[in-house]
Amino acid sequence: MSTTAPFGTWPSPITPGTITTRTVLLSQVRVDGADTYWVEQRASQAGRNVLLRRNGDGQIGEVLPLTPADELVDVRTRVHEYGGRAYAVDSGIIVVSHAGDGRLYRYDVAHRMRGLVPLTIYGDVRHGDLEIDTGRGLV
């Protein structure tokens, strides 16, 4: 049986929390050989940006391990607080900007046991719109 109620006063199972905590934004799509990478911003993890990969076999998963300080990587750059691309990938080598400490890290997908290798030191420096130049060995 239905109930009549004034406009805007009926109960709803959808709350602002339902919408905001389940939101996932996708960005920064890149292709490296048979692999596709992208960043997911997850509201359920306080807006943390996570790097994901779909390999040639169709398997999807998070790519990066913990930082050397045992932090979850937040793939984000603070250039102008908007950034640009916060990671680059070439031939399975990933360079990523971690918002937690502002540093760049290198990660080799084929040699996972090496973990994240810091490329920069701590400091008030911003990195953004990353690209890898393998010919000159530059990021």
Residue positions per predicted region:
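Beta-propeller folds
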Residues: M1-V139
